[in-house]
Regions:
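C-terminal region of N-terminal signal peptides and the immediate post-cleavage residues
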Residues: 7-14, 27-57, 162
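Short, charge/polar-rich alpha-helical segments
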Residues: 66-84
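Secondary-structure edge/capping motif, primarily at the C-terminal ends of alpha-helices
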Residues: 93-104
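Short, charged, amphipathic alpha-helical segments
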Residues: 108-120
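Amphipathic alpha-helical coiled-coil segments
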Residues: 118-135, 157-160
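Primary mode marks residue(s) on the alpha4-beta5-alpha5 output face of response regulator receiver
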Residues: 163, 168-246, 250-384, 392-488
């Protein structure tokens, strides 16, 4: 496999390289040292680590990007770049946390004095620059952003915002799956038979369609990334920033996807979709099987150098559908509309923006948000998502990349000030052998790529979409849905 060829164009702001050094060299290439490491024990030829229950496992920082509003257009690029630098600061602080366990054991103030304190100072400097850039561009920056500079350390068994089940270590504190990376752990998995039917309890990701209103659908077949288009950029959240995602994305549809792609590039690109009028970009973090495979990105930022290791698993099927609203007709999406659904930082941010849903084929009435399912033989692992489908009627993006779109309410309606557009629903099916979970350990687990400090938690799953359908095709999609027909 190989990643796409980057164009390396210079954006309005200076290109920012968001990266962190690899921490340790292991049998699978450059990998991250285990985040709990406090004492080592040999077990069956593996150098395992055992955790201390009170030890800091990861770093929890307020998400400044979600608190920013009303950024003038001419400051957007600079602000996005500063936010990407903050992400790199967290990655580097996590690196420091993971490689200083011996010092931490001998000094109860080590984490605060040498990691969290300096991190706060660096974040404060960037927040000051963000405020200056917003004000200089004619906006009014929030004077209280400085309150978000401080971060805290916390053990892995604390997940902000609750969830269906607790996450983290097992009661014995065993955390090393044998691959030397920070997660997943045994407690991140659940037998699908143990999940109660219809128990997914989230206000996000409800289906917009139903028996009434606009009952049609439009299916677009864009393959399963046969062209091996991968990179660790995020064109929506971090335009102009190399490795802005800190994890590898899997792309279908538009074939010109990297941090430096302009709207013109997207419009002129090839597409993997059978309907050549659909040049939209659909992307999500890859799933990997942590089996020791050295992938093409084993030594790269966003890959093995940031703890995302193992064999990349392509979906056996990627079903992409647009559906209507059970409350009435839908209107066309504007071209280049950008939508992020789910939250790549929801392990530390909490579940306010989370939109993960895991299941197994044949068990789709059982959906789980914060666990990976263990599926029986012959059953596929499923990742499903229903995007936000309420548009503010004006903007193709917003300062925090969320405010211009909203999820449907419980009755399928949009809140005041929003109008219904076709809802994007994606269903990814994977052929994955079930990991072995035994005695509080997991062997050959699969996991979603993540920011290093997010510990590969399943609740961090997310999807991204940029609408690049031509006007005729978008009108066809809307007409089909509103007429109650199933088209493709």
């Amino acid at each position: 496999m190989g990643r796409n060829t980057r164009k390396r164009r210079t954006p309005l702001a200076t290109k920012i390289v968001a990266g962190a050094a690899a921490l340790a060299v292991g049998g699978g290439g450059l990998v991250w040292a285990n985040f709990y490491a406090s004492a080592h024990e040999d077990h069956g030829g593996h150098n395992r680590t055992r955790s201390a229950g009170a030890q800091v496992a990861t770093i929890d920082c307020p998400d400044v990007g979600q608190k920013i509003r009303d950024v003038p257009d001419r400051a957007r690029g600079e602000v996005d770049g500063e936010l990407a630098t903050m992400d790199s600061q967290i990655t580097n602080a996590y690196q420091r946390l993971a490689t200083t366990r011996r010092a931490q054991a001998g000094d109860s103030q080590f984490v605060q004095n040498t990691i969290l304190g300096p991190l706060k100072d660096r974040r404060k400097a960037i927040i000051d620059r963000i405020q200056l850039e917003i004000n200089r561009a004619g906006g009014k920056a929030d004077d209280n952003l400085d309150e978000l500079a401080g971060c805290q350390g916390r053990p892995a068994d604390q997940q902000n915002g609750g969830g269906q089940n607790g996450g983290g270590q097992d009661q014995e504190g065993n955390d090393d799956n044998g691959n030397g990376v920070a997660g997943p752990v045994a407690e991140d998995f659940v037998d699908i038979n143990d999940v109660r039917p219809n128990s997914r309890d989230s206000r996000n990701g409800l289906a917009a369609d139903g028996d009434g209103g606009s009952t049609g659908s439009f299916t677009t077949d864009c393959g399963v990334n046969e062209n091996n288009l991968f990179n660790s950029d995020n064109l929506i959240a971090a335009p102009g920033v190399d490795n802005g995602a800190h994890h590898t994305h899997d792309y279908v549809g538009n074939q010109d996807n990297d941090a430096f792609s302009s709207d013109e590039d997207l419009a002129n690109a090839d597409t993997s979709c059978q309907n050549q009028g659909d040049k939209s970009t659909y992307y999500w973090p890859v799933l990997r099987l942590q089996d020791g495979t050295q992938e093409f990105d084993a030594n790269d930022q966003g890959g093995g150098a940031e703890g995302n290791i193992g064999k990349i698993l392509k979906p056996a099927e990627a079903q992409i559908r647009f559906v209507g609203s059970r409350q009435g007709d839908v209107v066309a999406m504007p071209k280049f509309l950008r939508v992020i659904t789910g939250d790549a930082k929801s392990f530390t941010n909490g579940d306010a923006n989370a939109n993960s849903s895991w299941s197994c084929s044949g068990f789709e009435d059982r959906q789980v948000t914060d666990k990976y399912p263990l599926c029986p033989e012959g059953s596929q692992v499923l990742r499903t998502v229903n995007f936000q489908s309420c548009w503010d009627g004006q903007n193709i993006d917003s300062a925090n990349h969320r405010d211009h779109m909203a999820f449907v309410q419980e009755d399928g309606s949009c809140a005041n000030g929003f109008q219904a557009v076709p809802q994007l629903q994606i269903r990814l099916a994977y052929d994955i052998p079930a990991p072995t979970v035994e005695n509080g350990q997991v062997r050959n687990p699969y996991a979603v790529d993540s920011f290093p400090e997010q510990l590969h938690k399943p609740i961090t799953d997310h999807n991204d979409f940029i609408n690049v359908m031509d006007e005729d095709l978008m009108n066809e999609v809307v007409d089909c849905i509103n007429r109650g027909e199933d088209c493709q």
